[in-house]
From Swiss-Prot:
Positions glycosylated per UniProt: N55, N105
Xref: Gene3D superfamilies: Immunoglobulins (2.60.40.10)
Protein's job: Associates with IL27 to form the IL-27 interleukin, a heterodimeric cytokine which functions in innate immunity. IL-27 has pro- and anti-inflammatory properties, that can regulate T-helper cell development, suppress T-cell proliferation, stimulate cytotoxic T-cell activity, induce isotype switching in B-cells, and that has diverse effects on innate immune cells. Among its target cells are CD4 T-helper cells which can differentiate in type 1 effector cells (TH1), type 2 effector cells (TH2) and IL17 producing helper T-cells (TH17).
Protein name: Interleukin-27 subunit beta
UniProt cross-references to PROSITE patterns, sorted A to Z: FN3, HEMATOPO_REC_L_F3
Any single Gene Ontology cellular-component annotation: extracellular region
Species per Swiss-Prot/TrEMBL record: Homo sapiens (Human)
One Gene Ontology biological process: positive regulation of type II interferon production
Signal sequence segment: 1-20
Listed InterPro entries: FN3_dom, FN3_IL27B_N, FN3_sf, Hematopoietin_rcpt_L_F3_CS, Ig-like_fold, IL11/IL27_subunit_beta
PANTHER family listed in its UniProt record: INTERLEUKIN-27 SUBUNIT BETA
Length: 229
């Protein structure tokens, strides 16, 4: 093979459009990861999205692992995924009140390379319960409205790891909600509500000891106060 022919072959192979192959995008995108302990203390659930890379339609798989502590050479364990292409995983071996953070590593594996995101967290700091369930309203005498609800079904031990609650409510046509709480029971009586008015009520939950953040608000429950009630 002459030197000229060899040079031509090298140039052709290094030019993806010339050889019919697709080259890698200009830059690999990083997974955007978030973790939440809505099932405290039995699990931490993490999920992620991957911004699309320019000019790429190739399938991407993910490898999710975690370690306890910031040491780069610490032992790692798999964060459980349903399939390699799943965009979520679960940590089931949760150490409570650990001073060392967990570090989740999510690696996106592309045909042309990989990109990784590292997310440190303390389990108690990412507690966010799911919304309370079964919110129901019962008009009572003397302009009172009873609100009852259940802890979120995903919260495994409400009798041990207690929750506190907030209520927000407004009557139909009002511009803003009134807010009541914290409440350490699963019922509450709203007083001085207006006769014939229709009320919208929602409930949110938080860890009793103030770890983490408030849940999202529950689905609204509605009730109309009768005349004389």
């Amino acid at each position: 093979m002459t030197p000229q022919l060899l040079l031509a072959l090298v140039l052709w192979a290094s030019c993806p459009p010339c050889s019919g192959r697709k080259g890698p995008p200009a830059a690999l995108t990083l997974p955007r990861v978030q973790c939440r302990a809505s099932r405290y203390p039995i699990a931490v659930d993490c999920s992620w999205t991957l911004p699309p890379a320019p000019n790429s339609t190739s399938p991407v798989s993910f490898i999710a692992t975690y370690r306890l502590g910031m040491a780069a050479r610490g032992h790692s364990w798999p964060c459980l995924q349903q399939t390699p292409t799943s965009t979520s995983c679960t940590i089931t071996d949760v150490q409570l009140f650990s001073m060392a953070p967990y570090v989740l590593n999510v690696t996106a594996v592309h045909p042309w390379g990989s990109s990784s995101s590292f997310v440190p967290f303390i389990t108690e700091h990412i507690i966010k319960p799911d919304p309370p369930e079964g919110v129901r309203l019962s008009p009572l005498a003397e302009r009172q409205l009873q609100v009852q609800w259940e802890p979120p079904g995903s919260w495994p031990f409400p009798e041990i790891f207690s929750l506190k609650y907030w209520i927000r409510y407004k009557r139909q046509g009002a511009a803003r909600f009134h807010r009541v709480g914290p409440i350490e029971a699963t019922s509450f009586i709203l007083r001085a509500v207006r006769p014939r008015a229709r009320y919208y009520v929602q409930v949110a939950a938080q860890d009793l000891t103030d770890y983490g953040e408030l849940s999202d608000w529950s689905l609204p429950a509605t009730a109309t106060m009768s005349l004389g009630k």
